[in-house]
Structures are given as structure tokens and as C-alpha cells.
Amino acid sequence: MRQSTLRRAAVLAAFALASFAASAAQVDVAGVKLDEAIDVHGSKLQLNGAGVRYKAVFRVYTAGLYLGKKAGTPEEVLAAPGAKRVTITMLRDIDANELGKLFTRGVEDNSPKNEMSQLIPGLLRMSGIFSEQKQLRTGETFTIDWVPGSGTIISVKGVPQGEPIKEQAFFNALVRIWLGPSPADWKLKDALLGKS
């Protein structure tokens, strides 16, 4: 009897410890759980920062930025070697076409004018991906990965969408939507850089 009580207590303690470890490995951002460490195509990445994108008073999505090592400036993020990920989880339903247009405008507002002609093929592909989705619903996630040797991989609900976009300039242009000189949301920029 005493042995089964000890065994039961040990099992409960192990379960509690495992639950604590699992919760310690995540960050809660507006009810969305983001892992502090992830694996992207064989590369170990850590959460650099995460926050919420607001439009007026409305929460639109959470965003998380993953890198191989911490970076505190946009320049450090763009120059960081290896794989990178931006993860977006919707906090409200949104027309996917509208989101695609906002991303395109964000790229235009934050990219050097002499780079825009190089970015057009990637922007057209991204617009096509969002057009096919029609609607992104609350809780749905998409990721934008930079994988050296492959390119930018956009996944919606965990499913890669088409072939990678090879040019790193395209991934950098997308990152500048949030970290550029005219970011989508200044507070989100600071959060992604780990400043909040």
C-alpha cells in the first residue's frame, strides 16, 4: 500500500515537473502560445521577440521572430546568418486578399526603391498564396521561413505553399514590414526586437 502511494506521488511529481517545463518553454502573447525554441528545417532557433499587431484599437495578429541568436536591431536581424522564421497567428478573421495587399504596401513602404523590381516576382507569388486562402480565421497561423540554400518558404496552417522564393532580398523585404523605417506597428517592432 505504501509503495503504491509513493509510486503515485512520484508519477504526479513527474507529471507536474513535465507540465512546468512545457509551460516554461512557451511565451503567451494575447492568448497565443509561442515556443521559446523551435527547429526550422534542421536549424535550432530561439524566439527573439513577439508582440501584437494593432490596427486602430483592434488586435489583428500576433507575430513572433525566431533567429539562431538574439538580435536587438533591424540591421542585426537582417545580417543574422542561418535560418529565420516569422510566425503570424490571427487574432481576428481577416480577408486574406486584404492582408496580402497590406503586406505588399508594407514592403513598398520599407524597401529601397532600387530593390522593388527584384521583389515583384515574390510579391506576385505571395499575393497568389493569399488569394487562394480567401479568409484567414482567428487562431490560424502562417509562417515565413528563410532557409539558406532553399529560399523563403511560406506555410499556411502548417502547409508549405508552392516552391521556395530563392532571393534572400525577398525575405528581408518581408521582415522590413515589421522592422523597417515605417513598420506596420511601432510597438510590435520593439517587441520583435525583444525591447518590450
Predicted regions located by residue number:
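Flexible glycine-rich active-site/ligand-binding loops centered on an Asp-His dyad
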Residues: 163-188
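Mid-length scaffold segments of soluble, non-membrane domains
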Residues: 71-149
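Cysteine/selenocysteine-centered motifs that mediate thiol-based redox chemistry or coordinate metal-sulfur cofactors
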Residues: 186-196
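N-terminal secretory signal peptides
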Residues: 25-80
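Short strand-turn-strand beta-turns centered on an Asx-Gly dipeptide
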Residues: 156-159
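Bacterial N-terminal signal peptides that target proteins for export
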Residues: 2-11
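N-terminal signal peptide c-region/cleavage motif recognized by signal peptidases
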Residues: 19-22
